[in-house]
A protein has these predicted regions:
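Short, amphipathic alpha-helical interaction segments positioned at domain boundaries
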Residues: 102-117
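Short basic-aromatic helix/loop recognition motifs at nucleic-acid
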Residues: 30, 43-51, 77
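A short, conserved structural fragment
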Residues: 83-94
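Short acidic, hydrophobic short linear motifs in intrinsically disordered regions
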Residues: 49-66
Length: 117
């Protein structure tokens, strides 16, 4: 049984931003951006929360409670990239650290993407 594709998603680094590009099966392509500084902060938070597990919303609340200015879109873009690169696993609808060094692995993948595409 062949299922129709829902969408194609790619990531790249442009102008010091992680860019998530989406081409849906129907509708117009779109993209969302996450500045490098926000990505790095989100990676730190994911490392801090990764053992207990977290949702997009709980990470966003964690960051805002700490007085850091990140947006829902920033968190969504960063988490999608971290899951795509197997730095986070999803279990029971919660993100969990898949590595012992989430921040280091996240930044390594970010810079590798920036250099190599």
């Amino acid at each position: 049984v062949t299922t129709p594709r829902e969408r194609d998603e790619t990531s790249e680094v442009l102008d010091d931003h992680l860019v998530r590009q989406v081409v849906p099966a129907r509708g117009q392509p779109y993209e969302h951006r996450c500045p490098r500084a926000a990505f790095e902060q989100i990676a730190h938070a994911a490392e801090e929360l990764g053992e207990q597990g977290f949702t997009l919303e709980s990470l966003l609340e964690y960051e805002r409670t700490a007085g850091r200015d990140v947006t829902f879109t920033n968190v969504a873009v960063a988490l999608a990239f971290l899951r795509e690169r197997s730095i986070l696993d999803v279990r029971y609808r919660r993100n969990h650290a898949a590595t012992t060094s989430v921040h280091l692995d996240a930044m390594t993948e970010y810079h590798a993407l920036a250099e190599n595409g």
